A protein has these predicted regions:
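Positively charged
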Residues: 17-187
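Bacterial Sec-dependent N-terminal signal peptides
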Residues: 1-21
Length: 187
């Protein structure tokens, strides 16, 4: 286990070296419209949907000055009463960066948590099958097989790196949202 952790930290350090700030186009989208409101979810059915939802996302530096604003606007999108979800990935609002919100059913009061550059570094062989939907194409639901447990790494908004084990429905949500970062939809 110690070798796995050391290897993981080495990989994290090398990946963070490739992280970049938001592009000019991404910056424009983040500050577009009323910045006190949510960012619009991009449906897969729209031409924009395929552009963002089928593309592999890039790592982001955690010190980009627009990151807190994007974080808040994504949170408003996933918790909006018109389309409440249990998770959201940045590509769903038109930003191809490795950023997700996940509802933590494994914590008291089930808070949402923001993950920067999330990675799944191990997954259990024990699988579970469950019914999943998606904010980007609400009309499609289906059975999806996911790992019951996963070991993840991520950076928080303060720039602190974490390694954590997730299980059950929280692990399912995390896997679903990280799939979005690879352009994968309802696997």
């Amino acid at each position: 286990m110690i070798k796995l952790l050391i290897g993981t930290l080495t990989i994290l350090c090398s990946l963070n070296c490739k992280a970049q700030n938001f592009t000019v186009a991404e910056q424009a989208l983040i500050v577009s419209g009323d910045t006190s409101k949510l960012l619009r979810l991009i449906p897969l059915a729209e031409p924009e949907g395929k552009k963002y939802l089928r593309k592999i996302s890039l790592d982001i530096t955690c010190n980009d000055p627009l990151l807190p604003l994007l974080k808040e606007r994504m949170y408003k999108a996933v918790t909006d009463s018109n389309h409440k979800g249990v998770g959201i990935a940045a590509p769903q609002v038109g930003i191809n960066r490795n950023l997700i919100w996940v509802k933590r059913y494994d914590k008291p009061n089930m808070p949402f948590e923001f993950f920067i550059n999330p990675k799944i570094i191990w997954h259990s062989k024990l699988l579970r099958k469950g019914f999943e939907g998606d904010l980007s194409f609400k009309e499609n639901w289906g059975d999806v097989v996911r790992s019951h447990s996963i070991l993840i790494s991520y950076t928080d908004i303060s720039g602190v790196q974490h390694i954590e084990m997730l299980e059950d429905f929280t692990a399912v949500i995390f896997q679903h949202e990280t799939d979005h970062l690879f352009g994968i939809l309802l696997t």
